[in-house]
């Protein structure tokens, strides 16, 4: 007969495995084998600053049946047609698709683009996704890769705005400008001309979770530039993501604002993992950092635009319950005034950093 101590240990071990096997977002919907019959439940599962994002919940379903693209006059059944409608829509796909957009795809507010149940690829050498002055957008279950620059040209922005000339774009996978309430979850992003995700120009209420970022140098930019004060109100949650392999820097790189980086798993980076300028507040909690082998790359953090260490001494960059391997280390600074950054609807449980590899094991598109 097993000893009471052994039994107690096994019960304790099972409790640890059970609590850490799935993160709270995945536990909310993936445990239901019939999730396809209740797709909109996903909108109840976000955590962090983007937890109020409803996307297309409560609207009609719109099914993408064609990979064709007409930037000015999209036809029904195409992704651009659904994404530019004024009405609330939950967009799904009838089959596996490889979509090469001819111009950036402007996503109107109150939309969910839900790739679950199909193998959906965007980019493929064309421009990708763009959001401006919209709210309540969910992007889930998409492979976004090979996004390229675009030229000046006419694009249908939305039904109400109509067709307008759009400046050339840099080749980001996902661009958000002055966006509120957006949730980017369970996507696989790689190999684009510029960044994978840009959150700028007063965007706030954003959660970026369960994504896989790989084979890309400049991953995630939060904040427009060092002179854009409106980004001081920016609040972004970066949680349960897998960074790497072959992710170079900006995971994320923040200007101004408040960024909570929680339970992410970091493979060795090329330049740095987390960076910033213009006094952002960066709270790193329960992440797992594995440093590169080169001794001069061991530091997780990079403060940009500081003439000296003392110039950044008051920036609030804190590491709590992070796990470090292969010599990785986080340089903390500043004093945080308030530890309760979330309201009751936004808050979620953050595990210790040693659990991050398990919590991110399903990051990216889920089959």
UniProtKB/Swiss-Prot annotation:
It is an enzyme of class 4 (lyase). The lineage of its organism: Eukaryota, Viridiplantae, Streptophyta, Embryophyta, Tracheophyta. Its EC number is 4.2.2.2. SMART domains: Amb_all. Disulfide bonds join 28-45, 128-147, 306-312. It comes from Juniperus virginiana (Eastern redcedar). Ca(2+) binds at residues 170, 194, 198. Pathway: Glycan metabolism; pectin degradation; 2-dehydro-3-deoxy-D-gluconate from pectin: step 2/5. This is Pectate lyase 1.
